């Protein structure tokens, strides 16, 4: 059960993490997936469907960049709606983590 909780927590913050990464710089999906796999141990298979969903929701948009080592790369960038969503999710995340920390701290 603890592993299931960890997986659900990671999935719950995945969109926030992607939006935060893209707020710093445009990126392609493999680069985002590699970073999230390394930093929060999230499987790449979860990230690609999320990127497609975020695009269809209007949070990100794509453009192609020629690559010297193969086919063009599809880069993602935040839209104005994506920036608004990031700010809202950051606010919710801070409030949520403060509440959880208060509860967990009180139980210690």
Residue ranges and their predicted role:
Residues 6-48, 65:
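N-terminal helix-turn-helix DNA-binding core of bacterial DNA-binding proteins
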Residues 49, 53:
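Alpha-helical DNA-recognition elements
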Residues 78-83:
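Accessory beta->alpha helical hairpin/"wing" motif in late/C-terminal subdomains of nucleic-acid enzymes
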Residues 3, 84-108:
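Amphipathic alpha-helical dimerization/coiled-coil segments
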Residues 57-72, 77:
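Beta-hairpin "wing" of winged helix-turn-helix
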Residues 1-2, 76:
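A positively charged, amphipathic N-terminal helix/segment that binds anionic biomolecules
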């Amino acid at each position: 059960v603890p592993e299931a909780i960890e997986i659900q927590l990671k999935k719950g913050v995945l969109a926030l993490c992607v939006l935060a990464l893209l707020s710093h710089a445009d990126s392609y999906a493999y680069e985002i997936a590699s970073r999230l796999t390394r930093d929060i141990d999230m499987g790449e298979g979860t990230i690609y469907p999320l990127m497609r969903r975020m695009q269809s929701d209007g949070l990100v948009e794509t453009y192609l960049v020629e690559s010297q080592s193969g086919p063009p790369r599809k880069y993602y960038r935040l839209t104005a709606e994506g920036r608004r969503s990031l700010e809202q999710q950051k606010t919710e995340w801070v409030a949520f983590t403060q509440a959880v920390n208060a509860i967990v701290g009180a139980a210690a």
